[in-house]
Amino acid sequence: MHPDLLPVIVGVGQINDRPENPLDGRDPVTLMADALRAAEADAGTALLADADWIGVVQQIAFPEIADASAPVAAALGAAHAELVQSKGPNGDSPILLLNEAANKIGAGEIKIALVTGAEALRTAGARKAAASGGQKGDALRDATHRVKVGYAQSHGLVVPTDVYPLYENALRASLGQTLAEGQAESGEIWSRFSEVA
């Protein structure tokens, strides 16, 4: 690869949207655009409007936004960018988009790529509750890509928090740990992640 084509991350941005009243929260498109603006500020140079490629992680909080890539591009003034949305809001979606962007840069197909994603589950739940007289929905469990009838779903395994404990218990059992030992080890690992975060 020619050194001029080496993909480099020049800016990163993150938005935590927790207004006192959840109804005042931002939607996923606004969160994505704001995160990219924060990344542009981190980069210290104007890049967004010149983006050649925008990769967006599919969001589920607002099902009426089927594909957030075009509204994000419009919010940034990136009229000529190739738009891509991940195939599902999976845990590996951001890294798959980052890999795709890096490969396109390395191949000389594009120069500026933007990767973004956002969820507004708290806001979506509050708005649904306000519209339905107090019944708060569960956007994760109600998402159309999860409401499929299959083996896992028939046993109540719908969202990551249903499945991850199975992995942890299988690992614990294979290591010959008691429940208390397994929980202590998980606690140590996650506390270190929290320190870094």
Residues covered by each model-derived region:
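Conserved phosphate-binding catalytic cores of ATP/NTP-utilizing and phosphoryl-transfer enzymes
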Residues: 95-103
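Conserved "HGTGT" condensation-loop signature of ketosynthase/thiolase-family condensing enzymes
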Residues: 1-88, 102-107, 114-197
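Elongated alpha-helical scaffolds
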Residues: 93-96, 108-114
